[in-house]
């Protein structure tokens, strides 16, 4: 697989997870998933940063992104890609990637609370890779990716995540640059 082919197909495949992970920053807020409850250690289970509204919109936007990819690539508007999914299958892939990304983000928040880190505080590696690892794990039974693609995504995602956060901060979408 050529490097260009790997890069293009990796971004096409993972885009729904990236969208799902970013959407709660824009459309989130409201009631937290943990209901404001505390864990055995007296700290919040997850915190206010993971809400039902953000989760819903993350799932919705990530899945819609994949369905749109399915429509575009099944019409061969931009040529062929490495994935031979019909539109329905793209929707399933998008839902799985989105659910995995959001679950990974929630797990990251859970771990950060156990470590005593307040909401919004940085946790390098955990913040950048938790969502992508779980997105790939959730989708793997339905659409396994190659080792090359998995490694590429694990290497490139922290840089993309940091860049996106800096842009969101400069646009006033996020309160912190990390």
From Swiss-Prot:
Q: Where in the cell is it found?
A: Cell membrane
Protein known as: CDP-archaeol synthase
Tell me one GO molecular function of this protein. Answer: CDP-2,3-bis-(O-geranylgeranyl)-sn-glycerol synthase activity
Q: What is any one of the record's Gene Ontology cellular component terms?
A: plasma membrane
User: To which species is this protein native?
Assistant: Methanococcus aeolicus (strain ATCC BAA-1280 / DSM 17508 / OCM 812 / Nankai-3)
Report the family membership.
Answer: Belongs to the CDP-archaeol synthase family.
Q: Does the keyword S-adenosyl-L-methionine feature in the UniProt annotation? A: no
Q: According to its UniProt record, which reaction does this protein catalyse? A: 2,3-bis-O-(geranylgeranyl)-sn-glycerol 1-phosphate + CTP + H(+) = CDP-2,3-bis-O-(geranylgeranyl)-sn-glycerol + diphosphate
Has UniProt tagged this entry with the keyword Lipid biosynthesis?
yes
**Annotated GO biological process:** glycerophospholipid biosynthetic process
Task: State which Enzyme Commission number(s) the record gives.
Answer: 2.7.7.67
């Amino acid at each position: 697989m050529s490097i260009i082919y790997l890069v293009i197909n990796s971004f096409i495949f993972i885009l729904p997870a990236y969208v799902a992970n970013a959407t709660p920053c824009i459309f989130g807020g409201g009631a937290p998933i943990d209901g404001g409850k505390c864990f055995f250690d007296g700290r919040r289970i997850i915190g206010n940063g993971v809400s039902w509204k953000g989760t819903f919109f993350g799932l919705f936007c990530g899945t819609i992104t994949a369905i749109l990819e399915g429509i575009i690539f099944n019409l061969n508007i931009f040529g062929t890609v490495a994935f031979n999914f019909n539109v329905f299958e793209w929707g399933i892939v998008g839902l799985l990637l989105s659910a995995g990304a959001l679950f990974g983000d929630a797990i990251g928040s859970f771990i950060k609370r156990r470590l005593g880190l307040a909401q919004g505080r940085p946790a390098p590696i955990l913040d950048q890779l938790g969502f992508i690892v779980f997105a790939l794990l959730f989708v793997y039974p339905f659409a396994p990716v190659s080792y090359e693609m998995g490694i590429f995504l694990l290497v490139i995602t922290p840089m993309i995540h940091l860049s996106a956060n800096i842009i969101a901060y400069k646009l006033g979408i996020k309160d912190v640059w990390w």
